[in-house]
Amino acid sequence: MARILITSALPYINGIKHLGNLAGSMLPADVYARFKRAQGHETLYICATDEHGTPAELAAAAAGQDVATYCAEQHVLQHEVGRAFGLSWDHFGRSSSPQNHRLTQHFCQALEDHGLIEERVDQMVYSVDDKRFLPDRYVEGTCPHCKFEKARGDQCDNCGNLLDPTDLIDPYSVISGSRNIEVRDTKHLYLLQTKMQDKIRAWVDAHADWPPLARSIAYKHLDEGLIDRGITRDLAWGIPVAQDGVPRPGFEEKVFYVWFDAPIEYIAATQEWAEGSPDRDWKRWWRTDAGADDVRYVQFMGKDNVAFHTVSFPATILGSEEPWKSVDMLKAFNWLNWYGGKFSTSNKRGVFMDAALEILPPDLWRWYLTANSPEGSDTAFTWEQFASAVNRDLADVLGNFVNRILKFNESKFEGVVPAGGEPGPLEEKLFADVSARLADLAEQMDAIEIRKSAQALRALWVVGNEYLQEAAPWTAIKTDRDRAAVIVRTALNLAALYAKISAPFIPFAAEKIGDAFGLDFPASWPSNDAKAELNTLSVGRPITVPEVLFKKIEDEQIAEWTARFGGAE
């Protein structure tokens, strides 16, 4: 059985993440990790805060803190809110860790040993008024490709093209707003991606099973021709350009570029996870010469991160010529937008994870964000659509079914699994239907089709309601108690089954349902044999009735949240 390594794109340290960040990487990765664990696979889900680069320095300055203190505090906050959302990371690390310092410096040396690192005198944007170079996000201006007026110095958020600060039209300093900008010489290290063009293309070619979104972005950059990328920056905060603790001459005041060290943190975070635990070995997950051959590595990220993960990081891994495990499946997502525009951390636009939990339980958000996963195209959050998904799917379908059958059982069968009767034609039809739908759900989950998986899960919930409505135990109990017992026993088993298969999506509610049956959680994933799965509860087993699982969202609440967070604009 394959071991499953899962990473989700590292959330930036500059504040609590918004729902778009959650929907496009961390949440689907968690759903998949929970599913694979339930199937019995040895699964490792790794994530970390991305703590270097200009976003960290700018956010720390705005908060009036030194950057190290700011990052330490924000890491704790992001970890806490992620756990509150049910994100089941095996480890949530920090890209500023000593492990990542050592490993990033190691990769640079390995690449240089193979002729893929070159020192170049570069022309970089310099702010005369700020008396400093302006790397990456310290400078903004007009994108030369799409003319977006707030493009950053590393990437345009509008068209997605990777940029250098000198590419920008009419640049200005993010620090001061000054347009008193010059271009000056500065020395930097470059990763010679041009030498890796054929090797990276062959690597991408070998992954024909990647989703079209990931492949199309990868080939766009390959077809345009790879360029050599600067991997150092004129910044104070970051990983020093050094080897064995000795600064590289001429680079004493420079650090590695955040997009060089951030993906390496996937490996370094696994080292963090393993450190101090003799039973954990990071190498068996990452080194093919140390047992990682049976690992299936799946990455989750938004589409704006794909270029770095299909070009720059592979250039690092492949260029080192060391036996590192590379990604098998790259699952990319489009954007979850906020009504007609984008969520924005810097502009505080949209609902953020901490605020979301202030108003509603995590499962409601988890369900909406997976059922409306932005896989095939960008999707837009609206309060009305959110309320509809919660009320229709969770309250009316799953919650209604569980509540009805458990209360009926408590009323008519003393709250225990009833004995009596044998399954009839209606149950046989149900067994066949549920078996087929379980197979479909597992197939969609294995394919990492998040939205289709949610649809398949909801379809299984609907089957239970339809069965209960057609079987009508409230009518059967009046004339045939054994027949009513069969119906109730079958429906109770369905509810227990729902707890197991819903857990990757709505783990808190699933555990509440499981607790009503005395099930151990997390539970194993069921087989596709519904006849067997719907006969697992022993006769006489006590069943309790939980509190209402899902409260409906009312129009008054929508109005209140629209006033607080915004809406149609």
From Swiss-Prot:
Its cofactor is Zn(2+). It is found in: Cytoplasm. The keyword Metal-binding applies. One of its GO terms (cellular component) is aminoacyl-tRNA synthetase multienzyme complex. Transmembrane segments: none annotated. GO terms for molecular function: ATP binding; metal ion binding; methionine-tRNA ligase activity. A motif ('HIGH' region) lies at residues 11-21. CDD domains: Anticodon_Ia_Met, MetRS_core. Pfam families: Anticodon_3 (PF19303), tRNA-synt_1g (PF09334). InterPro entries: Anticodon_Met, Met-tRNA_ligase_1, Met-tRNA_synth, Methionyl/Leucyl_tRNA_Synth, MetRS_core, MetRS_Zn, Rossmann-like_a/b/a_fold, tRNAsynth_Ia_anticodon-bd. The keyword Cell membrane does not apply. A motif ('KMSKS' region) lies at residues 342-346. ATP binds at T345. Keywords: Aminoacyl-tRNA synthetase, ATP-binding, Cytoplasm, Ligase, Metal-binding, Nucleotide-binding, Protein biosynthesis, Zinc. Zn(2+) binds at C143, C146, C156, C159. It catalyses: tRNA(Met) + L-methionine + ATP = L-methionyl-tRNA(Met) + AMP + diphosphate. Its EC number is 6.1.1.10. Binds 1 zinc ion per subunit. Belongs to the class-I aminoacyl-tRNA synthetase family. MetG type 1 subfamily. Is required not only for elongation of protein synthesis but also for the initiation of all mRNA translation through initiator tRNA(fMet) aminoacylation. This is Methionine--tRNA ligase. It comes from Caulobacter vibrioides (strain NA1000 / CB15N).
